[in-house]
Amino acid sequence: MTEKIRECIRQFLQMEAAGGILLLVFSVGAVIFANSPLRDHYFSFLNAPVIIQFGSIVELNKPLLMWVNDGFMAIFFVLVGLEVKREMLIGAISSYQKAIFPAIAACGGMIVPALVYWLVNQGVPDYHGGWAIPMATDIAFAIGVLVLLGTRVPLALKVFLLALAIIDDLGAIIVIALFFSHDLSTKALILASIAIVGLILLNRFKVSNLIAYVVVGIILWVSVLKSGVHATLAGVIIGFCVPLKGKNNSEPLVEMEHAIAPWSSFLILPLFAFCNAGIPLSGLGMEALTSPLTLGVTLGLLLGKPIGVFLFSYLSVKLHIAKLPEGINFKQIFAVSVLCGIGFTMSMFLASLAFGGGDGHLTAYARLGILFGSSVSAVVGYWLLFVTTKENANQ
């Protein structure tokens, strides 16, 4: 592994860890606000209308919550697209040998949680739409837990989690594209296609000016928003179209990644957590705790994730499809697989897509399951990592 890649991973881990702490603070703050005398102000804040108009051509009128989920999260997904592309070209999944082990683990971590959710909710048709919620891994929280253990965690284990989470994000993107698009508009899709062609041409000619990608990207985002396809996919496309190498030895991808990453970690994701984690607990009794929806999400994260990630990882090695990275063992892989049950922001995002956001009881049940499953996964995962990395601490 080159020094450049090591430095890139180090900076990424530090940024995600700090962001994870902020996510926790803003999430707790959201729950406090939603259950305090200020709850009416909290929900009024979320539903406050925000209007952006460009003459008579475009008018976007949405509540603040939707601007956060459709707008700010699109910027986050630009970062996801940039990270996935970078890792595919020069990083942790840049070759078959590097990618196959975390890729198989990620597949298990998506398939088994969805299956667990479906088994719990198969008798309740109204809940079927939430099957994708426990598939996601929140890389900020997961990396944050890893960083708490410092140097006792092997670099190979950190790289494994990073690669797995990135492939997991890619899976979430595919799920959003295939299952959460509706009422498609042909005109908007044509305009979006033209914008995509524009981005591809910018990439083809290795244009280094990031403003060009921002301008065409905004056109793409508005078009996708109007098309019926979820607007965050525009962010991913923008990220994929920024070239790794530009003219005059410039690095547009790295430049844009460094420009967006602090905003994503310290503003966008904390704001998303604050707007989506506020669950009014006063109206939730045993019915909420024992609901198949809540249980399906909780068990999907707590059991489905570790079983899927570990089982697929173990079988891939035993069947000689992949090799266990040097310096780590299956006990540590299992500990990381439990950490993958921290779904949080990505799971919250998928819940808002599945059940329409807002403060409806389906969304509240899903969020309750996400908070419980993610919290227990974080605590148990930390303890398992602490136990399984004792030898590293003694060296």
Curated annotation (Swiss-Prot):
Main location: membrane
Membrane-spanning parts: 18-38, 64-84, 100-120, 129-149, 160-180, 182-202, 205-225, 226-246, 266-286, 295-315, 333-353, 368-388
Record's GO cellular component terms: plasma membrane
InterPro entries (alphabetical): Na/H_antiporter_dom_sf, NhaA
Coiled-coil ranges per UniProt: none
Gene3D superfamilies hit by this protein: Na+/H+ antiporter like domain (1.20.1530.10)
Localization: Cell inner membrane
Membrane topology: Multi-pass membrane protein
Catalytically driven reaction(s): Na(+)(in) + 2 H(+)(out) = Na(+)(out) + 2 H(+)(in)
Domain of life: Bacteria
Keywords from the UniProt entry: Antiport, Cell inner membrane, Cell membrane, Ion transport, Membrane, Sodium, Sodium transport, Transmembrane, Transmembrane helix, Transport
Pfam family, one: Na_H_antiport_1
UniProt GO MF annotations: sodium:proton antiporter activity
One GO BP annotation of this record: regulation of pH
Function (record text): Na(+)/H(+) antiporter that extrudes sodium in exchange for external protons.
Family, per entry: Belongs to the NhaA Na(+)/H(+) (TC 2.A.33) antiporter family.
Full protein name: Na(+)/H(+) antiporter NhaA
Organism: Histophilus somni (strain 129Pt)
Gene name of the record: nhaA
